[in-house]
């Protein structure tokens, strides 16, 4: 079991607001339900000039060599808006992102991310702007994220973020919704047994 306690990685700045899930991964790539292999389609229409992925858009930031191994995405408000496709999160995780930092996220995207163990960090708009300035003036800079302390450290400056207890617990203990269900399987079976007995007794009484 891999417990996520923190992550240090290269930060790529994507200074665009309202990036929707169709931009993150276009609908033509949603035919599979296996989570693996979606990274190559991440930001497809921005990364490639042609539909066959033969010609890269050299102006798009993810195609810059310095960001080849970036694992932290810094972006603007309302990231992940649009349709609720979980494939958007799968593509980000499969590409190699561990953390996304923004002023706000779409609600469904937010929950899908934590279900797939992708840490989303919300900071104020002013803090995000400050971080963009740092990243743009220090290309290839690394951020140090501590989930335990709920902090982001950049050039010895520390930014604190909030995270609800449920998502905090799940990330620290490497748990998804299925794992949580299995942890309570005995209680679930006990409850189902009691309900089944109750319904049988009620049916016998009514008959």
From Swiss-Prot:
GO biological process: what's one of them? Answer: L-leucine biosynthetic process
Taking the record's annotation, the residue ranges forming a coiled coil are none
Output the InterPro entries linked to this UniProt entry: 3-IsopropMal_deHydase_ssu (IPR004431), Aconitase/3IPM_dehydase_swvl (IPR015928), AconitaseA/IPMdHydase_ssu_swvl (IPR000573), IPMI_Swivel (IPR033940), LeuD (IPR050075)
- GO molecular-function terms, A-Z: 3-isopropylmalate dehydratase activity
- EC number(s) per UniProt? 4.2.1.33
* CDD domains according to UniProt: IPMI_Swivel
The organism's superkingdom is given as Bacteria
Q: Which Pfam families match?
A: Aconitase_C
Q: Which UniProt keywords apply?
A: Amino-acid biosynthesis, Branched-chain amino acid biosynthesis, Leucine biosynthesis, Lyase, Plasmid
Annotated metabolic or biological route of this protein: Amino-acid biosynthesis; L-leucine biosynthesis; L-leucine from 3-methyl-2-oxobutanoate: step 2/4
As its record notes, the protein acts as a catalyst of: (2R,3S)-3-isopropylmalate = (2S)-2-isopropylmalate
GO CC, any one term: 3-isopropylmalate dehydratase complex
- NCBIfam families listed in its UniProt record: leuD, PRK01641.1
Give the function comment from the record: Catalyzes the isomerization between 2-isopropylmalate and 3-isopropylmalate, via the formation of 2-isopropylmaleate.
Q: How does it assemble?
A: Heterodimer of LeuC and LeuD.
Q: Which family does it belong to?
A: Belongs to the LeuD family. LeuD type 1 subfamily.
Protein's name according to its UniProt entry: 3-isopropylmalate dehydratase small subunit
Q: Which species is this UniProt entry from?
A: Buchnera aphidicola subsp. Acyrthosiphon pisum (strain APS) (Acyrthosiphon pisum symbiotic bacterium)
* UniProt lineage: Bacteria, Pseudomonadati, Pseudomonadota, Gammaproteobacteria, Enterobacterales
């Amino acid at each position: 079991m891999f417990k996520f306690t923190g992550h240090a990685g290269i930060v790529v700045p994507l200074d665009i607001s309202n990036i929707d899930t169709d931009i993150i991964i276009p609908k033509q790539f949603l035919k599979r339900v296996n989570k693996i292999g979606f990274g190559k389609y991440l930001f497809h229409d921005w990364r490639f000039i042609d539909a066959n992925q033969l010609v890269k858009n050299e102006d798009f930031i993810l195609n810059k060599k310095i960001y080849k191994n970036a694992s932290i995405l810094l972006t603007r408000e309302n990231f992940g808006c649009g349709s609720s496709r979980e494939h958007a999160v799968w593509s980000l995780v499969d590409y190699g992102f561990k953390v996304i930092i923004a002023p706000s996220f779409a609600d469904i995207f937010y929950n899908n991310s934590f279900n797939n163990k992708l840490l989303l960090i919300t900071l104020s708009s002013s803090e995000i702007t400050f971080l963009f300035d740092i990243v743009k003036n220090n290309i290839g800079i690394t951020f140090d994220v501590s989930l335990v302390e709920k902090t982001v450290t950049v050039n010895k400056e520390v930014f604190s973020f909030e995270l609800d207890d449920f998502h905090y617990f799940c990330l620290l203990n490497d748990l998804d919704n299925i794992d949580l269900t299995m942890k309570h399987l005995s209680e679930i079976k006990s409850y189902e047994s009691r309900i089944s007995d109750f319904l049988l007794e009620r049916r016998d009484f009514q008959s």
